[in-house]
Amino acid sequence: MEASGKLICRQRQVLFSFLLLGLSLAGAAEPRSYSVVEETEGSSFVTNLAKDLGLEQREFSRRGVRVVSRGNKLHLQLNQETADLLLNEKLDREDLCGHTEPCVLRFQVLLESPFEFFQAELQVIDINDHSPVFLDKQMLVKVSESSPPGTAFPLKNAEDLDIGQNNIENYIISPNSYFRVLTRKRSDGRKYPELVLDKALDREEEAELRLTLTALDGGSPPRSGTAQVYIEVVDVNDNAPEFEQPFYRVQISEDSPISFLVVKVSATDVDTGVNGEISYSLFQASDEISKTFKVDFLTGEIRLKKQLDFEKFQSYEVNIEARDAGGFSGKCTVLIQVIDVNDHAPEVTMSAFTSPIPENAPETVVALFSVSDLDSGENGKISCSIQEDLPFLLKSSVGNFYTLLTETPLDRESRAEYNVTITVTDLGTPRLTTHLNMTVLVSDVNDNAPAFTQTSYTLFVRENNSPALHIGSVSATDRDSGTNAQVTYSLLPPQDPHLPLASLVSINTDNGHLFALRSLDYEALQAFEFRVGASDRGSPALSSEALVRVLVLDANDNSPFVLYPLQNGSAPCTELVPRAAEPGYLVTKVVAVDGDSGQNAWLSYQLLKATEPGLFGVWAHNGEVRTARLLSERDAAKQRLVVLVKDNGEPPCSATATLHVLLVDGFSQPYLPLPEAAPAQGQADSLTVYLVVALASVSSLFLFSVLLFVAVLLCRRSRAASVGRCSVPEGPFPGHLVDVRGTGSLSQNYQYEVCLAGGSGTNEFQLLKPVLPNIQGHSFGPEMEQNSNFRNGFGFSLQLK
């Protein structure tokens, strides 16, 4: 399932998309060029493909842009979120291209929906990261004393892995009176030093010279390498060795074995004796030539030292030096051309592959791939084919790209999968063949919902956890295949609207891993539960859910807190103990609490310090401080005790409480030191008096205003009472009003009009309405509304209206 998930790109691509692909490929003949300096760190920015392709970010993500290149080595990576093309690793131009210039890495940019691709190339720019190196740190040059000024002596060159300006620029030699050095350039562009005699030598005056040869490259700053040149002045040897021909051209097959004889060169010297003895050697050979060829110093035979590879080097230019015993030498050049053989099988690079494909989608693009062969000529020409009994069609695209399409609609009920073999054959002799097998699956409809392995999950998390902690996982499986079986997980809205689920946990949508987003506190939240949903990616999508319970485990993260005696830094509280107290007398009790639970909240007490050790004791489980023995006159009157309160957690947390005990002979006039905070209390009492006076003044003004308003309202009522139908009874009532004093939670006095209905024959008062309007914020209450008829103390029935 994971393998198919990596290969899934798109499920549908119609023939119209393929036609668009062909058109776009035909118009992309000119590759897009980018450049990067070698040794640039991996993940460095190269370009933004969305801008280069003229795509918006949303369209760029939708079209599934990818970068591919020949072979398995991919030097670039594409950030799908930002469309940035980044280096996949640090590039070394010398490892990638050697002395080839420019160093170009070719790749392709593929787009889908519709299919498009663009050729592109990345040029790796050389930096001066290599110094010139002489393969021979010491050179011996024998110069005849008869050599005239101006005679030149070629020296062995230095090697520099850099190219262009960073390669060797010139040579210099240490100051001397006889020689100078010139920088010469060979046909292949390499530079070598040539020692030129400026002044005739005299062996009798100076038999040898020691000079330092320095090679400088053209970098900034330049790098250099040195070698020692030993010049031996010899007697006259007037003939140098001469080769039979100055230039040799040979051809050799790339599959020639090691020690194979490439060619034999020959030189002669007309001198006699030691001056006529000739030895052969490679001259100014590069590191690659020295590793590939060797020359017999006596016979001049050039043989192979390692296997040739036409794909790396098509030819070699080898310089051979013949030197006699007198120090004179002759040179010749051997051009060795490598003949290609069919030693590389074709390679297939898969760029896009879609499986499974829906059974009801004809002419769907199944795969896009490219073929290549490292050989040349007929050995590099390729043919591509598939089996004939399959409902697929293989079409050639631009360059060496091929597209595999469904030729007819597929029927899953008749066949659920197809094994397709792509056969790639070159035209060499003998022919080499490569096979690529693919399994194309036909997808089914989505008819199975994901099923959790459990209907409910219980997870345990210890409080004070680190954020993003993995607390557990849920898992669901789907019996479908392909995308219909790909399950994504999500958190469903909690049933408790007050539960901040989004800030408590998160879920990995791909694997169902649950993470705590923040540190949990057992004292604030002991447990919570939520539902998790699992949905497949079918169309339409099917889903299921499971219940997850999270139980927070308590940790010992709260130290005991002493409630009594107070330890807030104020004046200490002094406990009085009579000197006549018996052993076991209860002095006081240390009261402490712990915010944790369980054994983390089990508190124990012990006496940590005391003015008189052994005089007092503390009960370990309840914190009671009692006398341990009889008090004596020698015991100090003031005692200071420090009690340690410790919980039972691991590791335990603790707090201390300080007690002040005063031993007195009696309680009639105990000596109590005045608190140090007494002056501050006096200031607080003075402030309280001012506040009370101000509040009383404001209340008096408000009450006076209310009474004035009531008086005006009563005057208006007295005029209107003369035309009413109610008679005014005689009695202790002031005027025609009755004061009904509230006895409940209301503190105001309410006045009602009391009317006795004439001729009714009943002793009923009707309280029509209150004279004063309702004061906002008070109500008469539902009790009075439900029972409006009641009896008063005078035997009348009162009726509220």
From Swiss-Prot:
Disulfide bonds join C97-C103. Residues 30-691 are extracellular. GO terms for molecular function: calcium ion binding; identical protein binding. The chain crosses the membrane at residues 692-710. Its main location: membrane. InterPro entries: Cadherin-like_dom, Cadherin-like_sf, Cadherin_C, Cadherin_CS, Cadherin_N, Protocadherin/Cadherin-CA. It is a single-pass type I membrane protein. GO terms for cellular component: plasma membrane. Residues 36-134, 139-243, 248-348, 353-452, 457-562, 569-672 form the Cadherin domain. Residues 1-29 form the signal peptide. Coiled coil: none annotated. One of its GO terms (biological process) is homophilic cell adhesion via plasma membrane adhesion molecules. Keywords: Calcium, Cell adhesion, Cell membrane, Disulfide bond, Glycoprotein, Membrane, Metal-binding, Repeat, Signal, Transmembrane, Transmembrane helix. Glycans are attached at N419, N437, N568. Cadherin 1 to cadherin 4 domains mediate homophilic trans-interaction, the interaction with an identical protocadherin expressed by a neighboring cell. This is a head-to-tail interaction, the cadherin 1 domain interacting with the cadherin 4 domain and the cadherin 2 domain interacting the cadherin 3 domain of the other protocadherin. The cadherin 6 domain mediates promiscuous interactions with protocadherins on the same cell membrane. Each cadherin domain binds three calcium ions. Forms homodimers in trans (molecules expressed by two different cells). Forms promiscuous heterodimers in cis (at the plasma membrane of the same cell) with other protocadherins. PANTHER family: CADHERIN-87A, PROTOCADHERIN BETA-8. Calcium-dependent cell-adhesion protein involved in cells self-recognition and non-self discrimination. Thereby, it is involved in the establishment and maintenance of specific neuronal connections in the brain. This is Protocadherin beta-8. It comes from Homo sapiens (Human). The gene is PCDHB8.
